[in-house]
C-alpha cells in the first residue's frame, strides 16, 4: 500500500475514533440519566457495549495504520 492510501485511511480511522469517543460519552450520559430516574438500563448498557467494542476495533485499525505508515 502506498503512503497516500495509508494516510487517507489513517485520517478516516482517526475520524472514526473521534466519533466513537463522542458516541460513548453520549451513551454514558444517557445511561446515567436512566439510572438517576430509575428506568431500566439494559438496552442502554447493551448499546454502550456495542460502542465500546466498535471503538476497540477503530483504535486497533488506527494503530495498525500508524505502524504501517511508520514502516515506510
Regions found by a protein language model. Give the residues of each.
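Anionic, Ser/Thr-rich low-complexity intrinsically disordered regions
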Residues: 1-72
